[in-house]
Amino acid sequence: MELSQSRYLSALPELTWGIQRFCLVKQSKQEKYDKAYLRMAHEWGKLSYCKRKQVGAIVVKKRMIISDGYNGTPTGFENFCEDDEGYTKWYVLHAEANALSKVAASTQSCEGATLYITLSPCRECSKLIHQSGIKRVVYQIEYKDNSGLEFLKRAGVELQHLPTIESAV
């Protein structure tokens, strides 16, 4: 009995090292996916007609993109996001709201999905994100008012801030 315990204890450091290495490889692979999806969200944001901010969002579930969105005016409205004074019109939809609306109109569900977004969500969008069942939000730039992030954290949504998204070639 004592011999097998001794063998077990001597193998423990090697086992621990193996588990740590596995976790690092898995984390590294996940970070590559996160950065790739965030780059896609960045490209999607370029489709926005808004002059002040161009924000893109991608919803991913089981490594499949199930929705996308960018900030802009609702369907049927002229594509001018700012008024004559340069302020954003009140009815402009945020990127994440557009992406979540598309999912709601489809056969898909956001339950357990990840939202990739170029600008962290505002308070209103954070409520939609939580209610939609999204479990993880990866964002590039932090919005000046971080109460949306605080709400999501309190709701148990995992948050990942990736300020640098260029690929390591």
What are these regions (language model features)?
Residues 4-169:
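Zinc-dependent deaminase catalytic domain
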